[in-house]
Amino acid sequence: MSGDNQESRAPEESSAEEQKEMDDKVISPEKSEEIKLKARYPNLGPKPGGSDFLRKRLQKGQKYFDSGDYNVAKAKMKNKQLSTAAPDKTEVTGDHIPTPQDLPQRKPSLVASKLAG
């Protein structure tokens, strides 16, 4: 029985090897077109470091990922300009949590509520 297993494996291995050889011999249409174009235009190989456009973009540096990033940066610039224009404003918010004793008393409303009556 073990001899039968070895014989059954041999055709599978040979078929895998034959498949690899067939793949090497058969060229996809894209590869054949690429070979034709390389033969026709030998000087147009891929440039080292990518295309000129990509190189320019990388040198320039990307400022914003999308319009949201642009708007956030724009708002920060406006906030910086406003803070430099009014430096005497000393009111700081968010430093402490208010308690009922810290809050001012409510003023009575001038208009009587229709629900209270």
Curated annotation (Swiss-Prot):
Post-translation changes: Phosphorylation at Ser-67 by gwl during mitosis is essential for interaction with PPP2R2D (PR55-delta) and subsequent inactivation of PP2A.
Gene Ontology cellular component annotations, sorted alphabetically: cytoplasm
Pfam families per record: Endosulfine (PF04667)
Residues modified as Phosphothreonine: 99
Lineage top rank: taxon: Eukaryota
Residue positions where Phosphoserine is found in the record: 28, 67, 109
Localization per record: Cytoplasm
Residue runs in coiled coils: none
GO biological process, one term: mitotic cell cycle
Start and end residues of each stretch annotated as Disordered: 1-52, 79-117
GO molecular function: phosphatase inhibitor activity; protein phosphatase 2A binding; protein phosphatase inhibitor activity; protein phosphatase regulator activity
Keywords: Cell cycle, Cell division, Cytoplasm, Mitosis, Phosphoprotein, Protein phosphatase inhibitor
Biased composition (Basic and acidic residues): 1-37
Oligomeric form and interacting partners: Interacts (when phosphorylated at Ser-67) with ppp2r2d.
Family, per entry: Belongs to the endosulfine family.
Function: Protein phosphatase inhibitor that specifically inhibits protein phosphatase 2A (PP2A) during mitosis. When phosphorylated at Ser-67 during mitosis, specifically interacts with ppp2r2d (PR55-delta) and inhibits its activity, leading to inactivation of PP2A, an essential condition to keep cyclin-B1-CDK1 activity high during M phase.
Name the record gives this protein: cAMP-regulated phosphoprotein 19
Organism lineage string: Eukaryota, Metazoa, Chordata, Craniata, Vertebrata
